[in-house]
Amino acid sequence: MYKKLRLIIGVATMLSWAGQGNAQETNNTTLPLDAFASLPAMTQATVPLDGSKLAIIRATSKDGDYIVEIRPTNDLAAEPVRLGASRMEITDIGWLNNDKLLVNFRQNIQDGNDNYWVTKAAIVNGDGKGDWKIPFPKENRANFEVLSVLADDPDHILLTYDINNNRIPDVIKYNINTGSTQTILRGNETVSNGFIPDPKGEIRAGSGYDRATNSIKQYARVSGETDWKEIYSNSPNDRENWDFLYFSQENTDEVYVKANLGEDTTGIYTYNIRTGKYSERLFGLKSLDVDSVMLGAKSSNRGQLLGFSYTSKHPTRYFLDANEEAIYQGIEALFPDKFVSLVSRSEDDNAIVIRTSSDKDPGSYYLMSDKKKLDFLGERSPLIKPEHLSDVKFVKYTARDGRKIPAYITVPKGKGPFPAVVMPHGGPWVRDVVIYDEWSQLLAHHGYIVIQPQYRGSTGFGLDHWKAGDKKWGLEMQDDNDDAALYLVEKGLADKDKLAIFGWSYGGYAAFAGSMRKNNIYQCSIAGAGVTDLSRITATLFGASRYGRIYQAPTVKGVSPIEHVKDLNVPLLIIHGDIDQRVPVEQSRLFVDALEKLDKDFKYVELKGADHFSNTLYYRHKTEFYTELLDWLKNKC
């Protein structure tokens, strides 16, 4: 079951680039659709701090049907303890101490015409014995979240829970053995959520909404004190990035924050709660936002600043701690051309779970033991191998108004020009981070070159690029997508007579908008789970999100596809899940109703039992979706 490799961490491995010239050799093997449509065979692996056990989430079918397997790390061939939930889907696991595991799961509930997800968490023994303990099993679990394990108190965890059902959670100390609770902080109208404990478990940060100023405010307090101090306020009029990261280990009065503070890109600073002053910028880049800080998670270095991370083409780490850098470098040397993540570690680093992935690798998991032995645990997608997949390039092209637009290009094997697909991301206030992208690789595997424009309005590239998308839906934002296609044509990579646009969520909106432009450059369009009526968006897309309602909703202005149905001028495939809770299926149904009154070339596919996000699409949904997508591109473009 396990393939074993032996190694010594301290031995340097030379990286050879000599074989790259063969990377584009044509592979005539076309994978079955199952290879892409099957849910990941393995999604997580984790060890407790003593490193004695390994817990894995593993699929038992193409539709997932996930179970947890637990083995001793010193005997991975042993028959595992298996944990499963017959009516619930296991989504996530994490060790609370050396013996107890937190298992998160969800279930889809159909209640008349209503269809929704219920999420719960259970505490189970690592040996599989005893009952599953579900905190607050009968109540509405609004705002339930595990905040922290307590390093000095393995019998308790901190969690938030809306025990009074007033949308304001309290912070509760929960005994994982007995289920007894102690409320240690009551939320209030001022500091109502976003609670963060310091390394000792004291709740010293939180946030709240100020109705008078229509702003979200951040609060913190000095260790041992009860009074909250406002440390930052952000309103729609002065929208900037400001994120509380964690408390400093070196100075209990200081916290790490990610913020702009007058700069175009985010950087890392410390903020002194007592004095109200920021440090100089500790780390930042001119053209990219910083992602976060890397902090120690062991009892010996909890909260210690180890380095920073940011994303250009791939996530990148900048180390401050020499020991941490040496550990990463030693492991990375074993996996040339892979992005390496240490996803779980024991206190002494004698048990480290490693995940590797790349543009052309969906991901594999390994367990390193005693700093010298490596055990292969499994792959996310065993049917997909690097030789089946395509190279991904990161470029910047110039939009028609001169703005530089970053983009990822997935280039199929063979010689261009290729039929092309422009694939704008959802959001739109996100960005693509392409380590492995299933949709672009599926399309490239079938001969399409794919470009993923980080159009204006995308985050990660500074305030100016982010805010440039405000009120530009279907306008300059849409120009950026079209200019991505024209860039491929100009470079000789794409056939100008075989251009398509395909997207999901906001990307679905962009596909709707792209199907009705004058002098259209596309031959067809595929719109997945897209918004068609901007006037309805604040009541649906941002319904549960105060951040969305306050900051993003005022920026959603531009072309509303439902008002331009008559202008549709290319074949349009519309796909939507019938229980989509983010963009209700009515957005597509209304558009289809309008299309049926006109002589337009379109097809509507409704995925039964499918929600909005990719992790709620099952094998049956993906099989139908991918079949329709590839058929439309082949026969309509």
How does the language model describe each region?
Residues M1-I8:
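Bacterial N-terminal signal peptides that target proteins for export
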Residues M14, A23-A351, D359-K360:
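Beta-propeller folds
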Residues N193-I196, R317-K413, E438-Q441, H445-H446:
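Non-catalytic accessory segments flanking enzyme active sites
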Residues Y310, S357, M423-G427, G577:
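Glycine-rich His-Gly loop
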Residues P386-D497, W504, T538-T540:
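Cap/lid segment of the alpha/beta-hydrolase catalytic domain
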